[in-house]
């Protein structure tokens, strides 16, 4: 698999879970002998929702809720078959979305 690259994108609402998952992926890949670039922090996506507190009137009284989506990017250069097998077996939390390209 010389000259190839695996790109892993991680998404999560909890920054601690995504950092722990990225650390686990980097440790696994370096143990198998491939080189790693990252984890590169990508811009955090922030969604703000505005809700009226009262069920009927008092539109001036509002509440804001936000959801932050943290993202990380990891590139694996020159992966070996052992690296791919180790990545398939790695156990990550369910709260972390993994996209492998």
Curated annotation (Swiss-Prot):
Keywords for the protein's UniProt record, in alphabetical order: Ribonucleoprotein, Ribosomal protein
Its Gene Ontology biological processes? translation
Name a single GO cellular component: ribosome
Gene3D superfamilies xrefs: Ribosomal protein S10 domain
Q: Which SMART domains match?
A: Ribosomal_S10 (SM01403)
Cross-referenced Pfam families, in alphabetical order? Ribosomal_S10
Q: Does the keyword Ribonucleoprotein apply?
A: yes
Q: What highest taxon heads this organism's lineage?
A: Bacteria
Gene Ontology molecular function: structural constituent of ribosome; tRNA binding
Q: Which InterPro entries match?
A: Ribosomal_uS10 (IPR001848), Ribosomal_uS10_CS (IPR018268), Ribosomal_uS10_dom (IPR027486), Ribosomal_uS10_dom_sf (IPR036838)
Assigned protein family: Belongs to the universal ribosomal protein uS10 family.
Which NCBIfam families does the UniProt record give? PRK00596.1, rpsJ_bact
* Described purpose of this protein according to its UniProt entry: Involved in the binding of tRNA to the ribosomes.
Subunit structure, interactors included:
Part of the 30S ribosomal subunit.
Q: What is the name of this protein?
A: Small ribosomal subunit protein uS10
- The scientific name of the source species is Mycolicibacterium smegmatis (strain ATCC 700084 / mc(2)155)
Originating gene: rpsJ
């Amino acid at each position: 698999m010389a000259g190839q690259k695996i790109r892993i994108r991680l998404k999560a609402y909890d920054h601690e879970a995504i950092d722990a998952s990225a650390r686990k992926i980097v440790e696994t890949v370096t143990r198998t002998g491939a080189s790693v670039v990252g984890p590169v922090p990508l811009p955090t996506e922030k969604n703000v929702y505005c809700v009226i507190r009262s069920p009927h009137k008092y539109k001036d009284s509002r509440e804001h809720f936000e959801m932050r989506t943290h993202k990380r990017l990891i590139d694996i250069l020159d992966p070996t078959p052992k690296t791919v097998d180790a990545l398939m077996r790695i156990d990550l939390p369910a709260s972390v979305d993994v996209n492998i390209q």
